[in-house]
């Protein structure tokens, strides 16, 4: 949906001069709103043991991660590079949750060395690690109606987590290996806007945790319910009631664990930063090909979600409101027909040179970018709380793109030299 009134009020007066001096396309984020959204989440759970871990995969840009760390957020990492990024920014020990899948032993060892809260996605890894983390946590696989109805796909085909039926034995095996401190992780929905469904998804994890703890004879120090809270991408979407959501989960946690209530952890990414970013681009082409086509200087390399998922992102021409409307396809320049930001979208009639804003790109936007076709990833800017615009990641260049190339091939293996 459109960026907030506060963001628009501070950004729009700057856009004309900014885009005359700084080339489009670029993502720009609202520092004030990202910080405030984190604070809102923390406040909703303020009367309970709780910590939010920002999902690095959503927006792995150091300037943003540093802001959130200073606010008391932890970082949710799922790869070695994300771990290294978190450590480079000063995150230590339980500032980091490592929740990954299809994970190599070396990656687990790296997370263990960082002192992170490690989530085992597969029980077989428990047998391979030489030393266990201080707290052993397993991820329960998505299951039930909520998981099937979310963007996570069919729960029966999920690659994530351990089937619920195997959890008790997994914890018993960890106990036999000497583990005495435990947590549990589960994420049962994705981009969920229904309060009822989001609560049900969280309660499922809490109830599974209570049953497993009882049957395995262990105590849980924390329950991590992952992310999953949605944002209103469409104009008619309604934002989830955060206070009601938090209150329902706190009640469920107390009911399931009346004594020694575990700490609640969350790994929100999209919810924290998603609404507070916009991709600023410019119209560079207009043509008719049986359909009215509007070409932007941004491509799918800057925002993959519409092409990959068919995801909706609100798109506006901020300085074209008085023109007659028409129906247009808005496209990028990749040699792929799915490089489209919008199809059959009602818009004021665009002119070449118009600015076009694609909204809600503060999560899974730049982070999912790629360089196919030599279309490089754009810059990232931030509108600071003081009203300044700062560059937090420059646009990629030809040298960046070709940096790993060996222009003169390097011999790495020659079978004729092998000793038989």
Swiss-Prot record:
GO BP annotations listed: lysine biosynthetic process via diaminopimelate
Family of the protein in this entry: Belongs to the Orn/Lys/Arg decarboxylase class-II family.
Disulfide bonds: none
Signal peptide (UniProt feature, chain positions): none
Keyword Lyase among record annotations: yes
CDD domains assigned to the protein according to its UniProt record, in alphabetical order: PLPDE_III_DapDC
One Pfam family here: Orn_DAP_Arg_deC
Key words of the record: Decarboxylase, Lyase, Pyridoxal phosphate
Gene symbol of the encoding locus: tabA
Molecular function GO terms recorded: diaminopimelate decarboxylase activity
InterPro entries, per the entry: Ala_racemase/Decarboxylase_C, DAP_deCOOHase_LysA, De-COase2_C, De-COase2_CS, De-COase2_N, De-COase2_pyr-phos_BS, Orn/DAP/Arg_de-COase, PLP-binding_barrel
Entry cofactors: pyridoxal 5'-phosphate
Origin organism lineage: Bacteria, Pseudomonadati, Pseudomonadota, Gammaproteobacteria, Pseudomonadales
Described function: Involved in tabtoxin production and pathogenicity.
Domain of life per record: Bacteria
Name of the featured protein: Protein TabA
Chain positions found as N6-(pyridoxal phosphate)lysine: 57
